C-alpha cells in the first residue's frame, strides 16, 4: 500500500512539478512509459489549453471588433424613425411665382396727358398690351366732349368748354372684340354746376392731367344669354368658358346699355356734332 501510495504520489508530484522523467523511477517499465506519456500528455494539454485561451481571446477580440464594425454598419444603414429634431424649425425657402395666372386682375393708374384724347389713349393701350381694360373711375378736367345722350333720341352732341369728371367707367377689349364690348361712359359737371353725361362716341380731350383707375385682364369668357337647354347641357357635360377670349364672339350683338339720365336733369346748351351725320369720326357702339 505504501509503495502504491508512493508511486501515486510520485506521479502526482511529477505531474504537478513538471520535472524531468529521471527524478522518479519505478521497476515497472510500463509505468515509466505511462509516466513519460502522462508527462508528454500534460505538456500537450497545457499547450493546447494556452492555445485555446489565445484562440478564444482572439475570437473575442475579433468578435468585439466585428461587433463594433457591425454596429457601425447598422447605424449607417438603419434609417431613424420619425422626424429629425428641429426639422420643423428649419427656415423654408420662399415660394416664388415666376408666371402669373391668365385670370389675374392687375390694378393700373393711367395718367393721360393734357391735350390727348382719353378714349383713344386707353384704346391704344389695350391694343398694344393685348389686355382687356376695365375702367373703374377717373378724375381731372376735359374739354370738347362728344357724347350720346338718351334724351336726345340718340343724337351725338359735342360739349364745348371745360368740364370736371364726376364719374368715368367702361371697358376696352383688344381686337377682335365682339360688338359693344368697348364702351366708355362719363358724367361731367359744368362751370355753373350743371351735370351732363352719356356714352363717349367722339373726342374726349384732356384739359389737364387725367388720372384713370383701371384693372386689366387677359382671359375672359364670352357667353350669350339666356342659355337654352341644349347649350346648358353641353356646358355641364363638357365644361365651358375660358380658353380664347373671343372664340365664341360671332354674329351680331347689341351694345352695352347706357346710363339713363334723370328726366329732371337740367340741360346745358350743346351743339350737334356734324361729323356724325356725315359718317365721319368714331363709329357708334
UniProtKB/Swiss-Prot annotation:
Keywords from the named record: DNA-binding, Nucleus, Transcription, Transcription regulation
Disruption phenotype: Reproductive defects.
Record localization: Nucleus, Nucleoplasm
Chief place where the protein resides: nucleus
Example GO biological process: negative regulation of DNA-templated transcription
Chain intervals with Gly residues compositional bias: 63-73
UniProt biased composition (Basic residues): 39-50
Pfam family of the protein (one): PCC
Region (Disordered): 17-95
Keyword Transcription: yes
GO cellular component labels: nucleoplasm
PROSITE patterns the UniProt entry points to: PPC (PS51742)
GO MF terms held by the record: DNA binding; minor groove of adenine-thymine-rich DNA binding
DNA-binding region: 78-90
Keyword Nucleus: yes
Location of the PPC domain: 102-238
InterPro entries assigned: AHL15-29, PPC_dom
Tissue-wise expression: Preferentially expressed in roots, but also in flowers and leaves. Detected in the inflorescence meristem, floral primordia and developing reproductive organs.
Other remarks in the entry: Overexpression of AHL21 results in reproductive defects such as excessive outgrowth of stigmatic tissues, short valves, and excessive proliferation of a carpelloid organ at the lateral side of a pistil with exposed ovules.
Job description of the protein: Transcription factor that specifically binds AT-rich DNA sequences related to the nuclear matrix attachment regions (MARs). Binds to the MARs present in the ETTIN (ETT) promoter leading to a negative regulation of its gene expression. Functions as a molecular node downstream of the homeotic protein AGAMOUS (AG), regulating patterning and differentiation of reproductive organs. Acts as a chromatin remodeling factor that modifies the architecture of ETTIN (ETT) chromatin by modulating H3 methylation leading to the regulation of ETT expression.
Domain remarks: The PPC domain mediates interactions between AHL proteins.
Name by which UniProt lists this protein: AT-hook motif nuclear-localized protein 21
Amino acid at each position: 500500500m505504501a509503495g502504491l501510495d508512493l508511486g501515486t504520489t510520485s506521479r502526482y508530484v511529477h505531474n504537478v512539478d513538471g520535472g524531468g522523467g529521471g527524478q522518479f523511477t519505478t521497476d515497472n517499465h510500463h509505468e515509466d512509459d505511462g509516466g513519460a506519456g502522462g508527462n508528454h500528455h500534460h505538456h500537450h494539454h497545457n499547450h493546447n489549453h494556452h492555445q485555446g485561451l489565445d484562440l478564444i481571446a482572439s475570437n473575442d477580440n475579433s468578435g468585439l471588433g466585428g461587433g463594433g464594425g457591425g454596429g457601425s454598419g447598422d447605424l449607417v444603414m438603419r434609417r431613424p424613425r420619425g422626424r429629425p429634431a428641429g426639422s420643423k424649425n428649419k427656415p423654408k425657402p420662399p415660394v416664388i411665382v415666376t408666371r402669373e395666372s391668365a385670370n389675374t386682375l392687375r390694378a393700373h393708374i393711367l395718367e393721360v396727358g393734357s391735350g390727348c384724347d382719353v378714349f383713344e389713349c386707353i384704346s391704344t393701350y389695350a391694343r398694344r398690351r393685348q389686355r382687356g381694360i376695365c375702367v373703374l373711375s377717373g378724375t381731372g378736367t376735359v374739354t370738347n366732349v362728344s357724347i350720346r345722350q338718351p334724351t336726345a333720341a340718340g343724337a351725338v352732341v359735342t360739349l364745348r368748354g371745360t368740364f370736371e369728371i364726376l364719374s368715368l367707367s367702361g371697358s376696352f377689349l383688344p381686337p377682335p372684340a365682339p360688338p359693344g364690348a368697348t364702351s366708355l361712359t362719363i358724367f361731367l359737371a359744368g362751370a355753373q354746376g350743371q351735370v351732363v353725361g352719356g356714352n363717349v362716341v367722339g373726342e374726349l380731350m384732356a384739359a389737364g392731367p387725367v388720372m384713370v383707375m383701371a384693372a386689366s385682364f387677359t382671359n375672359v369668357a364670352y357667353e350669350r344669354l339666356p342659355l337654352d337647354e341644349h347649350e346648358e347641357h353641353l356646358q355641364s357635360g363638357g365644361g365651358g368658358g375660358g380658353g380664347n377670349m373671343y372664340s365664341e364672339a360671332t354674329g351680331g350683338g347689341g351694345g352695352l346699355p347706357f346710363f339713363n339720365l334723370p328726366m329732371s336733369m337740367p340741360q346745358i346748351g350743346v351743339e350737334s356734332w356734324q361729323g356724325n351725320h356725315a359718317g365721319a369720326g368714331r363709329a357708334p357702339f
